[in-house]
């Protein structure tokens, strides 16, 4: 947690990383967000930056049970409101952080007043779909199947990948790059 300068209106901002990232990807932007005047920015808004590790990732411990983005959003909302005392905040997320940020905005809109995501989740609001939406779904599924081998292997055979990734930094790089 890094608090903003007292000179400006402070806005709490939770930055949520993805995979294979960690909070390290935010290190270069935290200071400019907290102290914009040091970087020539004269805006009246700056941020209190909170950059937690997703449970089970990087610098965080392993959860007792498997949890998904919606549960993590609940945990992060409690972090922001109950633990840190913010009534309102905004969220930014990429990759898995996008999914978590989306749930923050959806389930916790009383507190999470805005989200910025850089990976758009494909969701449909409940209710009947138009013909255009049905056609989009059909094309999306075709594209998804042909372009998502990465996701399919990670979600169905992660143990297979783990052998290469644990054995060699080159194995990790080959998969990620």
Locate the predicted segments by residue.
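Glycine-rich, phosphate-binding/catalytic loops in enzymes
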Residues: 29-33, 67-68
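Short, small-residue-biased leader/transition segments that mark boundaries at the very start
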Residues: 2-8
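Conserved alpha/beta-hydrolase
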Residues: 33-59
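A contiguous catalytic/ligand-binding core that recognizes phosphate-bearing ligands
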Residues: 7, 20, 43
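The serine-hydrolase catalytic nucleophile loop
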Residues: 19-31
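A short, charged/proline- and glycine-enriched loop
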Residues: 9-11, 45-46
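Short beta-strand element of the alpha/beta-hydrolase
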Residues: 10-18
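Flexible "cap/lid" subdomain of the alpha/beta-hydrolase fold that forms the substrate-access gate
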Residues: 57, 63-92, 98-99, 103-177
């Amino acid at each position: 947690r890094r608090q903003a300068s007292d000179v400006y209106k402070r806005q709490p901002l939770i930055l949520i990383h993805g995979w294979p990232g960690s909070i390290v990807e935010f290190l270069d932007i935290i200071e400019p967000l907290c102290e914009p005047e040091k970087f020539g920015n004269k805006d009246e808004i700056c941020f209190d930056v909170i950059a937690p590790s997703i449970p089970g990732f990087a610098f965080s411990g392993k959860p007792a049970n498997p949890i998904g983005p919606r549960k993590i959003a609940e945990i992060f909302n409690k972090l922001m409101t109950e633990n840190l005392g913010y009534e309102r905040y905004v969220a930014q997320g990429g990759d898995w952080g996008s999914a978590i940020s989306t749930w923050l905005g959806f389930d916790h809109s009383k507190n999470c007043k805005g989200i910025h995501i850089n990976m758009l989740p494909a969701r449909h609001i409940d209710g009947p779909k138009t013909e255009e939406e049905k056609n989009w779904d059909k094309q999306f599924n075709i594209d998804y199947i042909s372009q998502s081998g990465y996701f399919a292997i990670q979600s169905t055979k992660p143990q297979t990948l783990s052998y290469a990734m644990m054995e060699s930094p080159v194995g990790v790089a080959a998969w990620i790059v």
